[in-house]
Amino acid sequence: PTRRSSDLDKARFPDLGKLAADLKAEGIRLVPIIDAGIRCDDNDPVCREGLEKGYFCTKEDGTPFVAAVWPGKAYFTDFLRPEARAWFGRQYKVLTDLGIEGFWNDMNEPALFYSPERLKAFFENAAALSRKDNLDQNDFFGLVRSVMGLMNAPEDYRSFYHDTTAGRVRHDRVHNLYGGCMTRAAGEAFQTLRPSQRTLLYCRSSIIGAHRWGGIWLGDNHSSWSQLLANIQMMPAVQMCGFLYSGADLCGFSEDTKIGRAHV
């Protein structure tokens, strides 16, 4: 409904609660997507509170780590900390108060489009190359690799930290825990926000054991026979790990997505 964390887009969704209720009456449940990144926005009270209380992951020098996702530059909640999980979980209240009963946690590996530092270095390199009127293969393919290397760069995952009871831990060493801890933040919050009620929750990134808080789906895939086979093989595997609620984008949503293939 919005790219900010604390409010709804009233122009597009003037009465989101009524929309959810009307859809439910038609047998359709509204399931909003919740991303891990919180937009860098000084006017957003959720963002300000997260900064003031130190709930976000930090760089080696202790300043908040920033990288871009869908809303642009964002901070990332330190889900390994119980108090940060509790704080993030409370943010679902704006939606549960509207009668929304299901949530889709996404981009929670966390996915990173780029970091400001790496983007600046890319533009500086591109500017230098732009002054040439003849790029050789090394220049050209180096530029291509640098574009592709902006997303989910290992260097970025090595550049921020979590605060734990055992001390500061660099993110890349606990990367696989992050999505599962976001799942836990939401699942534990729903015990308070929607007591004695069932809440649909599924996530793109998770860990074994997080099935006690929510389900999982197998993430983004291509519309190809090889990835369809991979999904068929993976779903029983995650179910054997406890994720009885699991699924996949069976028809895919990139490459050859003709409707006839989906019907097969």
Stretches found by the model and what they are:
Residues 264:
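Calmodulin-binding IQ motif helices
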Residues 1-261:
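Catalytic-domain carbohydrate-binding cleft regions of carbohydrate-active enzymes
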